[in-house]
Amino acid sequence: MKKTALLNAQLSHCIATLGHTESLTICDAGLPIPLSVERIDLALTAGVPSFLQTLNVVTNEMYVERVVIAEEIKEKNPEILTALLTQLQQLESHQGNQIQVEFESHETFKKFTLESKAIVRTGECSPYANVILYSGVPF
């Protein structure tokens, strides 16, 4: 059995096989997931697992160099945005790099998800709690 926090085999495999600049999306329960993209559905019930819990576990396994967030989160969900940016700052410190943070319209964000290797659906039920993580290299 694995020693690290991430126990979900499908998600662990996805992260392990990410190449440089490939992306993984973590989303709330409502984001539309294109049929052409692998769905890793972790949602059990409203709020379980949360967006932030899932982000924390994923970023313990994944080296991140860039993220994309929907612009609308600034107005519609500032609490999650603040917590997300705090987690990214902590990740920068842990990884020893600067993570590029980009904001795009929600419509553009959804188009970007088409290029994700997978989309991880959480039980989060708050608006615009979504992020696209782009893989970096730790060297």
UniProtKB/Swiss-Prot annotation:
Catalytic residues in the record: 20
Q: Cytoplasm as a keyword?
A: yes
The residues listed in the UniProt record as binding substrate, with positions renumbered to this chain, are 28, 106, 128-130
Q: Name its pathway.
A: Carbohydrate metabolism; D-ribose degradation; D-ribose 5-phosphate from beta-D-ribopyranose: step 1/2
According to the UniProt record, one GO cellular component term is: cytosol
**Gene Ontology molecular function: any one:** D-ribose pyranase activity
Principal location listed in the UniProt entry: cytoplasm
- Catalytic EC class: isomerase
Tell me any Pfam family this protein matches: RbsD_FucU
Reactions it catalyzes:
beta-D-ribopyranose = beta-D-ribofuranose
What InterPro entries does its record include?
Answer: D-ribose_pyranase, RbsD-like_sf, RbsD_FucU
**Keyword Thylakoid attributed:** no
Q: Where in the cell is it found?
A: Cytoplasm
State its Enzyme Commission number(s): 5.4.99.62
The family line of this record is: Belongs to the RbsD / FucU family. RbsD subfamily.
Q: What does this protein do?
A: Catalyzes the interconversion of beta-pyran and beta-furan forms of D-ribose.
Q: How does it assemble?
A: Homodecamer.
Return the HAMAP family for the record: D_rib_pyranase
Q: What is this protein called?
A: D-ribose pyranase
- What is the native source organism of this protein? Haemophilus influenzae (strain PittGG)
This protein's gene is called: rbsD
